[in-house]
Amino acid sequence: MTIDLILEKELKLFDKWKQQREFLCPDGIINFESYSKSKVKIMLLLKEANAVNEIVDFKDFLNNGAYDRKPTWENVLRWLYGIQNIDTDYNWSEIEKLFADEKIRTEYLKSILFCNLKKIGGTYTTNNFDFYDICIQDKELIIEQINLYFDNSLICP
């Protein structure tokens, strides 16, 4: 499937989703060029955004380095680096210095497919009953989104 077709289908999917969810937080492939160049295609599958009654566009957020909620995204950066450089021996302090560079940090974050199962935000702790109910209600849309991108992605829960 071409990039243009994926983007078109993604827009239609999120338009449909917005009819059901007022504060929908869109996600997906952050940057197609960076994603297509990455050695391993990674899909980061998370529960929900930490954003109550707020719309967070994760493509914008991650394309700009994800400087809000820094501890979460620094862990993600470590995972990405480790997965993309699995054959390399590296020193932990070198990795920390590497991601202090804004350009490198942003490039790594742009290389992923990011998907929250619950497309509306919650607090820093998930209400499991609410999460489960919404995932059941949105099951078909979640499956449609994953099928839109899925090829040989590695899914990291």
Q: What annotation goes with each model-predicted range?
A:
Residues 150-157:
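Alpha-helical hinge/cap motifs
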Residues 41-43, 83-149:
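Internal alpha/beta domain cores that form substrate/cofactor-binding pockets in large enzymes
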Residues 1-85, 101:
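Active-site and ligand/interface coordination hotspots across diverse enzymes
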Residues 76, 114-115, 157:
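Long, contiguous hydrophobic alpha-helical segments, chiefly transmembrane helices and signal peptides
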